[in-house]
Every structure is written in structure tokens, then in C-alpha cells.
């Protein structure tokens, strides 16, 4: 990616040839890489500085393109905002059912109604936040129109890559870790969402506010929440029921589940590697 970044200085970017070979997106990817690497086993002292550098580059010229209304948020998720700099991607479940979002057949009655969200997640919002009406139709209840504001909400698992909002939040977090103006950057992001300010926050309270904004902004957005939990050592608890059997599952900070299993085809093609600790081979 660093080579691609250098190449962009002398080579014209053509989206008709490659959607990823564009300065804004290459810088965004580099910001993501250094952001996650900074808390990994491969971390280096310069990681957050690099994350801040590339995140700042990924926010250049995008401020006026970020939606500041609920209707604007819905337009992005429906791919109806041609000026939005993110890259809209249709999920492979398009036209079928998607486990993350629910059912695409809601209009036929095949979809759960009045789905509750985690109470502590709901408590992060104020009604003035533009995401509130996009996410909820009643206190603590997921809106049927989510995520795109349509009559039934498109539940195809589509997503938007390279959201400029993510670049702002990476920048705020990186500046927090490098004693930069994290509050100012976070306030800029909050202004897009009418979500108050971070004035007066410092230390762990400021970091938690940044993580809270990530949690709110990236609700059910690919694996972002999972990466945050993995990055900062969160504990996951779930009470699940399958075929009338209940399971209480807790994934602790150092649990093996945070290192995902290596796919079977990779194990079969490379006998020099072994499955990650804790995972057992399932044969069908």
C-alpha cells in the first residue's frame, strides 16, 4: 500500500480501471492498517502517528460531502448520493436473506418485528442525534426502515467502504494516543451527527467517547464492532437459543475465539500450518 501511495504521485487515477487506486482510498486503507496494528502483537511506536497521518489525508476535501441529516444517512445506505466519497458494495446475499440485517422478504411478512437492541447501546443516543431516527422506530426498538429508510428497509447486507466518517474517527483515536487535538477532531465528527460535544473530556473518558461514537456510527457495519472489541480486549457475552436449546457464551479478553479459525482449504493446501489453538476440525 505504501508503494501504491507513492505511485499515485506520478500515475493518474482512473476509477474506470481500478476503484481502489485513488489517493483518498489508499490513504484510508493505510489509516485502517496502522490503526489496528497499533494495538496488535506487531505494533510499533510509530503506528498511531502513521494512522493519524493517513487518516488526515483521507479526510481532505470530504467534509462537505458527509451527510448531516437522517435523510442523508438513508441516501448513502440506499446508494442514492452520487457525491458521497464512500464506495457502495452489494452483499453476496443480494435478493436473498442476510443474517446480519434480517430478511429481505419483510414486505411478505417474513421478518421479525419489534427487534430490541442492547439497552446500553440505545442509551448512547439522544433523540437529536440524526442516527436516532435512522436506527429506531420506538425506544430501544430497531426501525423496520433501517438501514436505508425504505418502506421495509433493504436487508441485503450491502455496505459502504471507505466511509469518510471512519477516517475522522480513526484520526481522533490516533490523535488521542499521540497527544494531539483528539477533542477537536471528535467534535468535528459529532457535528456531522448533531451528537453534542466532547468538551471537557480527557484520558480514558475521552477514549471511551471515541469508541462510543464508533459503536454508534458503525452499528451492524461489517466487522467494525468486533475489531474494536478485539483491539481493546473487550468481553462478549451472549445468551442464545437454537432448536429449543439455550447457550450462555462468554468470550473473554484472551479467549481463543478472537483468533478466527483458518479455513479448511488453506489447511489442506499448506501442510506447514496448523489450526489456530482452540478450534477443532468439523467434518460433515
Give the residues covered by each predicted segment.
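Acidic/polar-rich alpha-helix caps and helix-coil junctions
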Residues: 1-101, 122-284
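Aromatic (Trp/Tyr) and acidic
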Residues: 107-109
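Acidic/Gly/His-enriched mid-domain segments of enzyme catalytic cores or analogous surface patches
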Residues: 112-118
Amino acid at each position: 500500500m505504501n508503494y501504491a501511495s507513492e505511485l499515485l504521485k506520478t500515475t493518474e487515477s482512473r476509477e474506470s480501471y481500478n476503484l481502489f487506486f485513488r489517493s483518498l482510498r489508499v490513504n484510508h486503507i493505510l489509516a485502517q492498517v496502522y490503526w489496528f496494528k497499533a494495538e496488535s502483537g506487531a505494533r510499533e511506536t510509530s503506528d498511531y502517528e502513521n494512522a493519524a497521518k493517513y487518516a488526515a489525508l483521507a479526510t481532505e476535501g470530504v467534509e462537505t460531502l458527509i451527510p448531516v441529516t437522517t435523510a442523508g444517512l438513508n441516501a448513502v445506505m440506499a446508494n442514492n448520493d452520487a457525491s458521497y466519497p464512500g464506495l457502495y458494495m452489494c452483499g453476496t446475499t443480494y435478493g436473498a436473506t442476510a443474517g446480519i440485517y434480517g430478511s429481505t422478504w419483510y414486505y411478505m411478512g417474513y421478518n421479525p418485528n419489534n427487534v430490541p437492541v442492547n439497552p446500553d447501546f440505545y442509551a448512547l443516543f439522544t433523540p437529536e442525534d440524526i442516527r436516532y431516527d435512522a436506527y429506531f422506530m420506538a425506544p430501544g426498538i430497531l426501525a423496520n426502515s433501517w438501514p436505508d429508510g425504505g418502506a421495509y428497509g433493504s436487508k441485503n447486507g450491502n455496505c459502504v467502504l471507505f466511509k469518510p466518517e471512519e477516517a475522522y474517527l480513526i484520526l481522533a483515536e490516533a490523535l488521542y494516543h499521540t497527544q494531539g487535538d483528539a477533542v477537536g477532531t471528535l467534535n468535528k465528527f459529532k457535528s456531522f451527527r448533531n451528537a453534542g460535544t466532547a468538551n471537557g473530556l480527557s484520558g480514558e473518558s475521552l477514549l471511551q467517547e471515541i469508541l462510543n461514537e464508533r459503536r454508534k456510527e458503525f452499528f451492524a457495519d461489517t466487522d467494525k464492532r468486533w475489531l474494536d472489541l478485539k483491539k481493546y480486549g473487550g468481553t462478549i457475552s451472549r445468551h442464545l437459543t437454537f432448536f429449543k436449546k439455550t447457550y450462555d457464551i462468554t468470550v473473554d479478553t484472551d479467549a481463543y475465539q478472537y483468533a478466527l479459525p483458518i479455513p479448511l482449504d488453506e489447511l489442506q493446501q499448506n501442510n506447514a500450518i496448523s489450526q489456530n489453538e482452540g478450534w477443532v476440525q468439523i467434518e460433515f
